[in-house]
Swiss-Prot record:
Record-annotated active site: 165, 395
Induction (UniProt): Up-regulated by high sucrose and by low phosphate stresses.
Swiss-Prot/TrEMBL keywords: Acyltransferase, Detoxification, Transferase
Identification of the protein by name: Phenolic glucoside malonyltransferase 2
Length: 451
């Protein structure tokens, strides 16, 4: 695969006068944002197939519409043009927006096979990463957001986004993409009210000590303690050429059959689609890793608290509003044995129930305590994305995406999750592994559905 970068455009909001009225020069991070301060960016790729995708058509029609609509929507998403800083006299970092803020948009062209890269089978991770831009970060400043638009001549194009996780979570990112798509497709001149982001941090009420706890947790992950205010990301995992990304699918019927398996053993559980899909994917993940059955494994996911706070936050709240919850230091044998799937479903069900029944301080304290005692040798499963984000609704005027991938699941053994593109109630599950291990996961996954 050869990628040719054509230009790096600096897209500014259409009218910066909005800054003054929005009072968004400075947006402090909350304790929901702080756990992600030093994590690698969240990287996602949207693939769009085109019936007409010549260079002339792309550069004269498609690209100008994408840039113009992006400029329009940035009026309402000013923090995406900013960067994170941690001023010497401040107890925690903030997002700073300036009048010369921009979103960098890389324009590129690829000679890769579009249908293969946008498919569901095993694809080289390196080729997918090439479709996502860099997100500049240093000790003193961390860029919030960047975009890459890549043309595959006579095939289609992709939109790759890199987002700093301390700036926005998956819901905010997905809402932004869908709002941008709507403005582009309908050629709107202003943001629909139901998509307008809310920046009111005063709605989030919590003890200030939680800020300090999250900052201490983040600091504990740094090897170099000489500059405790450094915003430089934690080192990324170095992956070989044999690492692939694949998307496995659970149909609605698959979910129902798996749900019945659990009900027959534990009828009183909370068995949402998320619980079933995560439990099944996780057990396949652990079985494929194999090894010592007494080895330590931990599983983690994040709960969205927009509807769980008092008062509730608007659905369009900008930023992170998630707390990680998890089950730590279990034995791999629990998930490798015959009833491993049911065990995983029981654990995840209890964790989901606890999101509504426990105080936010208790959940945060439990996360900090559990995460602090993790060993680097522990197999640690996490979830990126959700079946509720509606990522396949992002139609810019040339049809819905044929595929959406979260490329950053290569960092930390994450499992990506999204709604199935062409079936209500189905689930797409993305995994990133060495090819030999991926083959094993796929085998466990498919055999389990047909046994």
């Amino acid at each position: 695969m050869t990628l040719h970068v054509i230009e790096t455009a600096r897209v500014t909001p259409t009218d910066y006068s909005v800054i003054n009225s929005a009072n968004l020069h400075k947006l402090p991070l909350t304790f929901f944002d702080l756990p992600w301060l030093l994590f690698q960016p969240v990287k996602r790729v949207f693939f769009y197939e085109l019936t007409e995708s010549t260079r002339d058509h792309f550069h004269s029609i498609i690209l100008p519409k994408l840039k113009d609509s992006l400029s329009l929507i940035l009026r309402n998403y000013l923090p995406l043009t900013g960067h994170i800083t941690w001023e010497p006299n401040e107890p925690k970092p903030s997002i700073i927006v300036s009048e010369n803020g921009v979103v960098l948009v890389t324009i590129a062209e690829s000679d890769a096979d579009f249908s293969h890269l946008s498919g569901y089978g095993q694809r080289p991770l390196s080729e997918l990463h090439a479709l996502v831009p860099k997100l500049p970060v240093s000790d003193d400043s961390a860029t919030a957001f960047s975009i890459q638009i890549t043309l595959f001549p006579n095939q289609g194009f992709s939109i790759g986004v890199a987002a700093h996780h301390a700036v926005l979570d998956g819901k905010t990112s997905s809402t932004f993409i869908k709002a941008w798509a709507q403005i582009c497709k309908q050629e709107l001149q202003s943001m629909p009210e139901n998509l307008t982001p809310s920046y009111d941090r005063s709605l989030i009420k919590y003890p200030t000590y939680l800020d300090e706890k999250m900052i201490e947790l983040v600091r504990s992950l740094k090897e170099d303690q000489t500059n405790i205010r450094s915003l430089t990301s934690l080192p990324s995992s170095k992956l070989g050429d044999d690492v692939v990304l694949a998307t496995l699918v659970l149909s609605r019927a698959d979910i129902e059959r798996l749900r019945e398996q659990v009900k027959n053993v534990s009828p009183s559980l909370h068995l949402s689609t998320f619980v079933i899909a995560y439990a099944y994917a996780w057990t396949c993940f652990v079985k494929a890793r194999g090894g010592n059955k007494d080895r330590s494994v931990s599983l983690l996911f994040v709960g969205d608290f927009r509807d769980r706070l008092d008062p509730k936050l608007p659905g369009t709240y900008f930023g992170n509003c998630m707390i990680p919850v998890g089950c730590y230091n279990r034995k791999a044998a629990e998930f490798m044995e015959e009833k491993g799937f049911v065990t995983a479903a029981e654990i995840i069900s209890d964790l989901v129930k606890g999101l509504s029944s426990r105080k936010i301080e208790t959940i945060a304290d439990t996360f900090v305590e559990g995460f602090s005692f993790q060993s680097w040798s522990t197999q640690f499963g996490t979830i990126a994305g959700s079946t509720r984000l509606g990522v396949y609704e992002a139609d810019f005027g040339w049809g819905r995406p044929v595929k959406v991938d979260i490329v950053s699941i290569d960092q930390g053994e994450a499992i990506a999750m999204a709604e199935r593109r062409d079936e209500s109630g189905g689930v797409e599950i993305g995994m990133c592994l060495k090819k030999t291990e991926m083959d094993s996961v796929v085998s466990f996954f498919n055999n389990g559905l047909h046994s």
